[in-house]
């Protein structure tokens, strides 16, 4: 049985993590520099928010950060931006950040604080990494993110052994979604390393789609993936992936209603039944007679689709 709830204050939650054992989740919107804390048990406005513009230090705060992925590792959340160009195809340094925040949760609330300093050279590392040379990321980085073969990084997940997995919405080389393992995120944000350690972790057949979100389910030792088109086409599907380089991803049947999922959080695991909440990109929906992104902040909202998948 599925249900839909609404959260206020933003038109999307392009990156989010649930804080284990609690009803809280922390979400970023791709358009601003604010992390918002929501309570799943009482959907509505954020219970708290944290402003990050002074920490991320964009050259122009009017430029969007395009935060797209989040991964919880212990009491730290890693966040990654798209590392792509803007919608006009212009390079924007505000979209080139890997950063971390500390997080602690109690029944009363959530505390979030920046950790270390943002790493700004991940795009250079991706372009130069010998293991990634076949995917021509240098050429991809020169294209608009929603062009065929552009560059758009949207998924981030923890991996057993301490790595993070980066999931690419674009490019989709030879029709397969690209997953790259980042081996030293902690050293990068704590300024103990100057270059990312990168290797190919997966080339997934997602029906020609890229990765919009990826989430690790430790109880099941499996990843759940929201797959979608590299452009605005409404073509979404959920997959389960065991996580090995040669493992195949398996499609899951979920009725997405009219949601446009770009993030998911796992809320409960009961055997093979995994309870998830899919967070919808509702920037194009109407709010107060205007497109959500153009509406007054208090009118903005995004939806969560709560459902169960069998893996």
Per-range role (PLM):
Residues 1-311:
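Sequence/structural signature of beta-propeller domains
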């Amino acid at each position: 049985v599925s249900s839909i709830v609404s959260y206020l204050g933003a038109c999307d939650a392009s990156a989010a993590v649930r804080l284990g054992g609690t009803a809280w989740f922390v979400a970023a919107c791709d358009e601003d520099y604010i992390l918002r804390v929501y309570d799943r048990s009482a959907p509505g406005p954020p219970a708290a928010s944290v402003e990050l513009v002074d920490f991320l230090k964009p050259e122009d705060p009017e430029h969007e950060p395009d935060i797209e992925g989040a991964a919880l590792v212990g009491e730290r959340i890693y966040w990654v931006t798209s590392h792509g160009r803007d919608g006009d195809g212009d390079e924007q340094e505000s979209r080139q950040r890997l950063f971390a925040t500390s997080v602690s949760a109690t029944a009363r609330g959530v505390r979030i604080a920046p950790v270390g300093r943002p790493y700004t050279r991940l795009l250079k590392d991706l372009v130069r990494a010998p293991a990634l040379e076949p995917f021509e990321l240098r050429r991809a980085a020169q294209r608009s993110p929603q062009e065929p073969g552009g560059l758009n990084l949207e998924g981030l997940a923890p991996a057993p052994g301490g790595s993070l997995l980066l999931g690419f919405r674009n490019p989709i080389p030879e029709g397969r979604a690209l997953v790259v393992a980042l081996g030293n995120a902690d050293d990068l944000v704590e300024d103990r390393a100057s270059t990312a350690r990168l290797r190919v972790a997966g080339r997934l057949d997602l029906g020609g789609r890229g990765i919009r979100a990826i989430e690790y389910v430790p109880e099941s030792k499996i990843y759940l993936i929201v797959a979608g088109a590299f452009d605005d086409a409404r073509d979404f599907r959920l997959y389960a992936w065991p996580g090995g380089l040669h493992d195949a991803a398996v499609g899951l049947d979920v009725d997405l209603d009219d949601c446009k999922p770009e993030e998911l959080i796992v809320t409960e695991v009961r055997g093979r039944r995994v309870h998830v909440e899919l967070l919808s990109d509702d920037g194009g929906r109407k709010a107060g007679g205007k497109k959500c992104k153009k509406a007054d902040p208090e009118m903005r909202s995004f939806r969560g689709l709560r459902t169960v998948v069998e893996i």
